């Protein structure tokens, strides 16, 4: 049954992630990069500084750092560990190159999303902030494009329920737990007649995870933000440290690994032994998994950015931009390099988390069981916070679709928890293909909006920095000092 389903899903995936969508995403990032004057390079130090600072007196529900952590909680997940592995195995090492290229351009895209989210956000009757692509499409492009905003919101709900939010994350967690506690299926349980038998570790993991998710979701965005603010930085540092140790232990292989990655990115045979492996496949998998991981262009992060306590669209845009830098250019690159260095991507019979597990077991100077445990721990917490972040995104999308009917949102929350329980019982390939399909469909209306509103983005950016530059020259103060002072004086535009 799963074979037929996978074949059908692959056909749909190849259609959605064809050349037009890749051109749309890459061209959009390139256009914004050029029009903003390589802002992701010039303003990255300032963005990283502001990332750790809270703005006093800003409008919104949570701090900019909490908003970033909420966004990072949704982006740093199985995509960084499992997604990179599936991309390299399916598209060859060259997929990692295209993933980084897409992420570099995606930093300009993510900046633009964050800026528009704050500029066009509104406030609900109960006082919580509302923002995201559906609002900057409707308010920025005009009421005539409300249908496009609704399409985005619909696919946003689908991505949360069937894609990044639940199935892929829970599947990744259960695979890691299964591989660590019961790799030989010593004890199995039959849940439903048509599902077959599954390891007890998978069943217990799905039950515990569903309960934990339910416990946090009841608290809303503030509880999600508080949990994410603790877990995300801590686990990201742990994963970073162990990945760097792995690379240092194999430092002599690094030049050859980089050469392989770059060569394979432009090679007609990026996959060993297969004429199917081509530059197009490497690009397709790299861009698709990159979008899965950092969500630049997807339109999800601006939903969290709209809740940030800030009066400056530019400030939040810069803070949002750092998410893509941390998620893909740092964490995904470390994962991909680890996989290429250890040759894990060439081992037959491995898929998904098994590939990264092999890399950690054979690349780290620790016992294999300990290395597996560290990876499992990182994956569990990364995926858990992603599930939380995507529930928030999906609820805001549904709130927009239902005209603010919170009864629908509360019902959806329990459906979401049910989807968390179901996720482990699907095949890895089906889960990731479904995620890719809905990601692509969600990205299309958002990228159209970014193209249409690129003039607004450039105007807001130039006005902010030009004013700060002139004031700094007139008062003989530093540019950064003036920028920070202007943040506390600037008011969000009225809608």
Placement of each model-derived feature along the sequence:
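Extracellular loop-to-transmembrane helix junctions
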Residues: 10-46, 89-128, 148, 327-334, ...
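Alpha-helical membrane segments and immediately flanking helix-loop junctions
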Residues: 57-90, 116-140, 151-154, 158, ...
């Amino acid at each position: 049954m799963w074979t037929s389903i996978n074949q059908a899903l692959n056909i749909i995936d190849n259609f959605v992630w064809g050349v037009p969508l890749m051109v749309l995403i890459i061209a959009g990032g390139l256009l914004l990069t050029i029009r903003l004057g390589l802002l992701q390079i010039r303003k990255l130090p300032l963005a990283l500084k502001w990332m750790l600072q809270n703005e006093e007196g800003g409008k919104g529900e949570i701090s900019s750092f909490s908003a970033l952590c909420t966004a990072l909680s949704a982006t740093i997940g199985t995509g960084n560990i499992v997604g990179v592995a599936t991309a390299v195995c399916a598209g060859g090492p060259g997929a990692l190159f295209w993933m980084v290229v897409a992420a570099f351009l995606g930093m300009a895209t993510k900046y633009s999303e964050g800026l528009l989210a704050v500029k066009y956000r509104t406030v609900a009757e109960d006082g919580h902030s509302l923002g995201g692509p559906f609002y900057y499409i409707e308010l920025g492009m005009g009421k005539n494009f409300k249908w496009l905003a609704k399409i985005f919101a619909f696919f946003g709900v689908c991505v949360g329920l069937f894609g990044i939010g639940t199935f892929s994350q829970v599947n990744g967690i259960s695979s890691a737990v299964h591989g660590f506690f019961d790799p030989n299926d010593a004890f199995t349980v039959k849940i439903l007649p048509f599902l077959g038998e599954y390891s007890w570790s998978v069943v217990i993991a799905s039950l515990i995870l569903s309960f934990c998710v339910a416990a946090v979701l009841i608290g809303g965005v503030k509880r999600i933000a508080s949990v994410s603010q603790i877990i995300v930085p801590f686990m990201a540092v742990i994963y970073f440290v162990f990945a760097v140790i792995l690379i240092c232990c194999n430092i002599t292989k690094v030049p050859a690994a980089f050469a392989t990655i770059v060569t394979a990115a432009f090679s007609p045979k990026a996959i060993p032994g297969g004429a199917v492996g081509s530059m197009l496949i490497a690009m397709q998998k790299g861009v698709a998994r990159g979008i899965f991981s950092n969500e630049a262009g997807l339109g999800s992060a601006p939903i969290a950015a709209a809740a940030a306590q800030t009066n400056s669209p530019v400030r939040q845009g810069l803070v949002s931009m750092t998410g893509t830098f941390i998620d893909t250019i740092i964490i995904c690159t470390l994962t991909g390099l680890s996989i290429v260095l250890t040759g894990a991507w060439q081992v037959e019979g491995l898929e998904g988390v098994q590939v990264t597990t092999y890399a950690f077991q054979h690349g780290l100077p620790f016992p294999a069981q300990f290395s597996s445990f560290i990876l499992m721990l990182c994956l569990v917490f990364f995926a858990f916070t992603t599930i939380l972040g995507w529930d928030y995104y999906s609820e805001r999308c549904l709130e927009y679709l239902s005209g603010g009917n919170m009864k629908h949102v509360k019902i959806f929350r329990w459906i979401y928890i049910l989807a968390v329980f179901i996720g482990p019982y699907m095949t890895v390939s089906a889960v990731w293909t479904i995620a890719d399909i809905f990601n692509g469909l969600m990205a299309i209306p958002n990228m159209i909006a970014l193209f249409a509103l690129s003039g607004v983005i450039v105007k807001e950016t130039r006005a902010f920095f030009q004013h700060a530059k002139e004031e700094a020259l007139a008062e003989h103060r530093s540019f950064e000092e003036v920028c920070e002072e202007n943040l506390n004086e600037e008011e969000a535009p009225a809608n």
